[in-house]
Amino acid sequence: MDIDQFISKWERSAGSEQGNSQTYLGELCEVLEVEKPRPTTGDPARDAYVFERGVDYLDDDGARRRWGRIDLYKRDCFVLESKQGRRADDGTLPGERQARPGMDAVLERARAQAKQYIAALDRSIAPPPPFIIICDVGATFDLYAEFTRTGGEYTPYPDARAKRIRLGDLRDPDNLDLLRTVWTDPA
């Protein structure tokens, strides 16, 4: 699949994150020409690049353990959390979302969720990955980085104004190269 086919297929996607995320990200791997995620084994030491990587973490008040699943995890590279906004039916340009009230808040909560998952990863297996990717399926990728690999503060990457890669921006080879680097050799 080439980038134009990918964008054309996904720019008007709708439905649920759960119904679309894994297919979308698998096809993105094809476009990036990187390996696709492997089957999950349930063994954290072996699940280095998988969808739905299980983690046990403390909730926001630190009082209760919870079970969660990282949408896409690649050891030494990233934790990716995905959401999906509504499809634009109002005459906006293809690939643009309706101004869904609260979508930025949804994406910020996904970032907080990713940070909880990172804190819960077993550091005896590997240090925290350098990137968090927040994906609005069919619309955007927001990048955050923390290169000390201590799980500290993940900041917008490369900066606050340029952290978001829109679906149509993937036609720019520099954006494809950036995502490919995050996927394969981010350090």
Task: Give the label of every model feature segment.
Residues 1-8, 15, 61-68, 77, ...:
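Short, basic/polar, glycine-containing "phosphate-handling" surface segments that engage DNA
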Residues 22, 26, 53, 70, ...:
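N-terminal, well-ordered alpha-helical segments
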Residues 28, 38-76:
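Active-site metal-binding core of divalent-cation-utilizing nuclease and nuclease-like domains
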Residues 1-47:
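Charged, often low-complexity linker/regulatory segments
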